[in-house]
Amino acid sequence: MTLNNTTKGYFFAFLSVFATSNVYIFSKAALSQADIATFGLYWFGFGLIWNVLFATKTGKIKHIQTLNQNNFLILLILGLLEIAGTTFFFMAIRTVPNPAIVSFLGNINPVIVTLLGLFILKERYNKPEVIGILLILLGAFIISFKGGAKFSSMFITGAEYIMYSGLFYGASAIIAKKNVQKLTPTIMALSRTIFLFVFSFSAVLLLSRSWTLDWFPLWNIIIGSVLGPFLTVISGYQAIKYLEVGRVSILGSTKGIVVLIGAYVYFGKFPETYQLLGGLLSISGVILISVGKLLLKKKKV
């Protein structure tokens, strides 16, 4: 049976949501007992193995020979952006007690992508997008606000890492979308993992961190590395290859619900009622932004 491109896109988008959601769970479990540099060494080390095996098995690794100097420059830029974004992401995972909160706050990413699209790609806004942005910002404020007399103590610790991560991921997403057809999802995923592994290896070496792990974090890393550096990245790039980014974002916004369930089952943790409300507002905002982008695209056709 041959699947059309739209069906393939939805399949990869759902696969990406499942894999991404579980990354929050297994990385949180591993980081509870591992230094972030050592964690990265093993996480991306295993991820590199899975990516190389997949690229070799499918024959996609041969595509490297067709890349030109400009392609390698794009991969370098993406690699540096991913190093920054991923480092801040795992700092947030380690710092914020409940991974579901990180997932909900991560819905700020579509706002960043939309704003970057306005300034870099000269894209336009419409009413659903504006309302969506406001809902996400309101949701993020509700989730992260904890009160206090000083601005520095008003928000939960770790919220700033999610913002930094979103900025770098947003820039990476725009560049990746413009180059995914040329570079292919497999090569982009492989390149990303190589950059992150080399960075983690260097961090362990320069910071004199431990080279070994106990069995509990190692087991969670093995599972998570299949879902994260391998399955999440490849399926995510495949999804934007076949679908509009707006449709992928709508499906991706549901990951917070999956993480919420997973965090409760795995850690016995559940967000406060106001944080859950903020999370639902942010999900609604992502959906509105995505719908707005799709409406704009239909008007152009």
For each of these PLM feature ranges, what is it?
Residues 7-12, 37-57, 72-77, 132-135, ...:
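Hydrophobic alpha-helical transmembrane segments of multi-pass integral membrane proteins
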